[in-house]
């Protein structure tokens, strides 16, 4: 009886405390030293802002242990503006409730600008992984970049130069970029929109989307799909198991699309001539006997489209190949 009475009073006390907590201590969104504790980082003011000036084409190097990296072109010549956003998440419960455990760097060496956040020592707090440091950086158009994050997304918009991007699990978005790009993500998607140059991309678990590209595309995927539209240039794809869909406006040096188990569908411009090779579980070629000459059965195709010339190779072990002539 004593045990039952004790449990009864304990339950009543817990309910009272819960009501008091809700009434007297509603959620608080504090603002201290430029940091919002609101869980929505979009509404935050920057924790720190720094500006630099570069003379001519510059180079930007960014690293963060956890958070997003956004690099955006702006119209001010030579100006580089860095905004650092801090989201503490649940870190106020842990040993990392202040920023003393992190080394924040923003500096300039000639025409190179460096922005980084690193841990001074490994924090073992229960919620230490919830703390994120995100960069939003405004740069002139002529700017090469080296962008890395262990746990966030990367976006690059409107710049020209040589670019390297790496994230351990986030997405990578590349818009209106010219030059040479190398992008890698361990688990996210990669997208290209209105790009011009040489584009290398690899994802271990996501898809790759391309919308209007001029130049050379080299794409590698573990199991994701490729969706490519309005391509002018050269394209090489290696996928372990995903589908490949590609529409070409013009073809330069050639096309090679390879997937182990997925399907391939390609739209080729009728004004070009191609040396075409395809192997698949089943092949579908648009019925145009005047443009194709060579050998063809349900699983293999070898011949020319039009007058021939540009090599096109389409290979899948277990999927289908569909070839459309526009």
Regions of interest found by a model, annotated:
Residues 1-326:
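Intrinsically disordered, low-complexity terminal regions
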């Amino acid at each position: 009886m004593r045990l039952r009475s004790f449990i009864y009073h304990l339950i009543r006390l817990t309910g009272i405390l819960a009501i008091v907590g809700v009434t007297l201590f509603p959620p608080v969104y504090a603002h201290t030293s430029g940091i919002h504790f609101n869980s929505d980082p979009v509404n935050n003011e920057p924790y720190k802002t720094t500006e630099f000036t570069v003379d001519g084409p510059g180079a930007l190097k960014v690293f963060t242990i956890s958070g997003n990296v956004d690099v955006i072109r702006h119209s001010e010549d030579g100006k580089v503006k860095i905004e650092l956003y801090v989201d503490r998440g649940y870190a106020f419960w842990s040993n990392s409730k202040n920023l003393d455990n992190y080394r924040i760097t923003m500096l300039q060496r000639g025409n190179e600008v460096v922005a980084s956040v690193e841990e001074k020592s490994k924090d073992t707090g229960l919620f230490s992984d919830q703390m994120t440091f995100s960069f939003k950086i405004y740069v002139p158009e002529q700017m090469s970049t080296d962008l890395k994050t262990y746990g966030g997304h990367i976006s690059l918009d409107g710049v020209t130069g040589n670019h390297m991007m790496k994230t351990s699990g986030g997405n990578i978005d590349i818009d209106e970029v010219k030059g040479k790009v190398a992008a890698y993500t361990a688990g996210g998607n990669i997208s290209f929109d209105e790009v011009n140059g040489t584009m290398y991309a690899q994802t271990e678990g996501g898809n790759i989307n391309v919308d209007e590209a001029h130049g050379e595309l080299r794409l590698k995927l573990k199991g994701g799909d490729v969706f490519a539209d309005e391509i002018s240039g050269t394209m090489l794809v290696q996928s372990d198991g995903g589908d490949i869909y590609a529409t070409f406006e013009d073809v330069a040096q050639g096309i090679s699309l390879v997937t182990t188990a997925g399907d391939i569908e390609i739209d080729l411009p009728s004004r070009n001539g191609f040396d075409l090779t395809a192997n698949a579980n089943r092949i579908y070629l648009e019925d145009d006997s005047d443009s194709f000459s060579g050998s063809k059965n349900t699983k293999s195709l070898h011949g020319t489209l039009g007058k021939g010339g540009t090599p096109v190779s389409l290979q899948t072990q277990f999927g289908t190949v569909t070839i459309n002539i526009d």
